[in-house]
Design a protein with these regions (language model features):
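Residues in soluble alpha-helical coiled-coils and helical-bundle/repeat scaffolds
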Residues: 37-40, 123, 127, 195, ...
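Hydrophobic helical membrane-anchoring modules
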Residues: 2-26, 150, 203-354
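Acceptor/aglycone-binding surface of glycosyltransferases and processive sugar-polymer synthases
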Residues: 80, 89-95, 99-109, 126-204, ...
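Short, conserved catalytic or interaction motifs in soluble domains
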Residues: 95, 120-122, 188, 220, ...
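Residue-level detector of functionally special positions within alpha-helical transmembrane segments
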Residues: 37, 72-73, 187, 260, ...
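Residue-level signature of catalytic and energy-coupling elements of molecular machines
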Residues: 49, 106, 121, 143, ...
Length: 354
């Protein structure tokens, strides 16, 4: 972005909407998209959204959250779209805080009576939004989407995803269907409820189910990524799954009691057998191999349980620290007079600059 363009954009951002127009009334629909190094997808995403929403004759806004992209091009693309269409608004994080926090920042600044969250890679098709709105018009406060695999997903990812959803539902009591994603519609009332949550470990898929309200599901055909590569590697997916489980269930902690009882029974059995052989028979007590093996098993179980306990203690430490969930370094298209919501001034848990 050239210096002249930056100065022109900065001067315009001092006005109400960032590009010189009068602040519009709250739209009926807000679309929230979290993007991390997605510069090649944003233009196509915007065009597809316009194509899908124009026939509906509905007022809308698009909130693009730059989740600390390592390139400048992503934010520059958001700025260009904003100056082309004032309905496009931008939120920029000071660093990468994570996809869930990006979506939450968008929810924090959305003004629509209905809010749709989706990904920037166009695997969530904008053409499905009219179906979401139809369900909302029929009284549904939450409209979930369930992904139909297009065949591009690897066997490993399908299997691990299915295993996670079944495990999560079993441990938490919150029923998540396999294939469920962050592509969903939320009524304003549901959004307001979500914004009251103060926990640091965000797992929106679980939280949306937890708040209740009438809901429905629609299926959509998962598209291939339009450009770029997925930023969600195996390590991130594993961390995401663990956050979801520990955010909604204490069963891993309680499982330690059961495992401890079972291993104690095994230990008592081994001890009783050794005493019986020593006192009532002429057979020699088995050698050190069995004893060391049993001790290794017990210590292994003990350290696993200590690790689980440590994870929960780390979660408690994060909550006690009271740090903001994310820091907003820059915004586009939001008022600076506080007359309407903006990511920079919603609550003390956020820190941002206009």
């Amino acid at each position: 972005m050239s210096r002249v363009y930056q100065e022109r954009l900065a001067s315009r951002s001092r006005l109400s909407d960032g590009c010189g127009s009068v602040p519009e009334p709250s739209p009926k629909l807000s679309i929230v998209v979290a993007a991390y190094c997605e510069k090649d997808n944003l233009q196509k995403l915007y065009e597809d959204l316009v194509e899908a929403l124009t026939p509906l004759d509905v007022t809308w806004e698009l909130i693009l959250v730059d989740d600390g992209s390592t390139d400048e091009d992503t934010w520059n693309e958001i700025a260009a779209l904003h100056c082309r269409d004032a309905r496009v608004k931008g939120v920029r994080f000071s660093r990468n805080f994570g996809h869930q926090y990006g979506l939450f920042a968008g929810l924090s600044s959305a003004r629509g009576q209905a809010v749709v969250t989706m990904d920037a890679d166009l695997q969530h098709p904008p053409s499905a939004i009219p179906l979401l709105l139809r369900e909302w018009d029929n009284g549904r406060k939450i409209v979930h989407t369930v992904r139909i695999d297009n065949g591009d997903t690897s066997w490993l990812k399908r299997t691990t995803s299915l295993a996670f959803y079944k495990l999560f539902s079993f441990l938490s009591g919150v029923d998540l269907s396999a294939g469920m994603s962050d592509f969903r519609l939320l009524d304003r009332r549901v959004v307001n409820e979500l914004l009251q949550f103060r926990e640091m470990g965000l797992f929106l898929r679980g939280l949306v189910h937890w708040v209740g309200y009438p809901s429905s599901k629609i299926e959509f055909q998962c598209q291939s990524r339009f450009a770029g590569t997925s930023k969600y590697n195996f390590r991130r997916m594993l961390r995401f799954a663990w956050t979801g489980i520990t955010s909604f269930s204490t069963i891993p902690l309680r499982a330690g009691i059961i495992i401890g009882l079972l291993t104690s029974l095994v230990a008592f059995y081994q001890l009783g057998e050794a005493l019986w052989l020593k006192c009532f028979t002429d057979r020699a007590v088995p050698g050190w191999a069995s004893i060391i093996g049993l001790q290794s098993l017990l210590f292994g179980v003990l350290f696993i349980l200590l690790g689980i306990l440590g994870e929960y203690m780390a979660r408690i430490l994060e909550e006690v620290r009271g740090r903001p969930r994310f820091i907003v370094s820059e915004t586009l298209g939001f008022p600076v007079d506080g007359s309407q919501p903006s990511p920079a001034g919603l609550a003390s848990q956020y820190q941002g600059l206009n």
